[in-house]
């Protein structure tokens, strides 16, 4: 049995869920998200509780069941609380600047890297070496943060680069001379 798929999703106050031919729309205080779900998965709303049911116990249905429940829960959490990923920059001269919705990064290249915020994503730069990516769609927040990190991933010898806050970067020893 899919343990994740069987968990009940509780709708917080102010969050509404509407479904139409497999397309589910979740509205909340932070915004609105729409996603298409497999038609085999039945979504039942009873008051403030949402449950997902699958037609049979085949392996494929179990995986779709758990994934659908996780996606729906992420939509509910996104429109009620939102998601954020924090990144930090380490290295001499590494810094970030924000101008409107465009993030300019100086990360040791001959040119600055510019990242334009996708729709629904906001950037914050509390200090020149910290970046906060936030929004209501968990997937887009994660993809945007991963793209920013990929512009200069942390290297193992000195640890320079862009990393997630709290990320452990495994360090290596340099070559030993004669």
Curated annotation (Swiss-Prot):
HAMAP family given in the database record: Ribosomal_uL6_B (MF_01365_B)
UniProt-listed GO biological process terms: cytoplasmic translation
Record bears the keyword RNA-binding: yes
InterPro entries, per database record: Ribosomal_uL6-like, Ribosomal_uL6-like_a/b-dom_sf, Ribosomal_uL6_a/b-dom, Ribosomal_uL6_bac-type, Ribosomal_uL6_CS
Subunit structure, as described in the record: Part of the 50S ribosomal subunit.
GO cellular component term, pick one: cytosolic large ribosomal subunit
Protein name: Large ribosomal subunit protein uL6
Species classification: Bacteria, Bacillati, Bacillota, Bacilli, Lactobacillales
Keywords: Ribonucleoprotein, Ribosomal protein, RNA-binding, rRNA-binding
Gene: rplF
């Amino acid at each position: 049995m899919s343990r994740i798929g069987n968990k009940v999703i509780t709708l917080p106050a102010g969050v509404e869920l509407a479904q139409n031919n497999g397309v589910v729309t979740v509205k909340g205080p932070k915004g609105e998200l729409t996603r298409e779900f497999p038609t085999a998965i039945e979504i039942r709303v009873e008051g403030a509780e949402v449950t997902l049911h699958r037609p049979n116990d085949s392996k494929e249905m179990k995986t779709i069941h758990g994934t659908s429940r996780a996606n729906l829960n992420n939509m509910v959490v996104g429109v009620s609380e939102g998601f954020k990923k924090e990144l930090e920059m380490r290295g001499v001269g590494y810094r970030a600047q924000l101008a409107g919705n465009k993030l300019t990064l100086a990360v040791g290249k001959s040119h600055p890297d510019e990242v334009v915020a996708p729709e629904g994503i906001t950037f914050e730069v509390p200090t020149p070496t910290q970046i906060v990516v936030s929004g209501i769609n968990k997937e887009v927040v994660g993809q945007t943060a991963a793209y920013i990190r990929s512009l200069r991933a942390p290297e193992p010898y000195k640890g320079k680069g862009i990393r997630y806050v709290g990320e452990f970067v495994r360090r290596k020893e340099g070559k030993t001379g004669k």
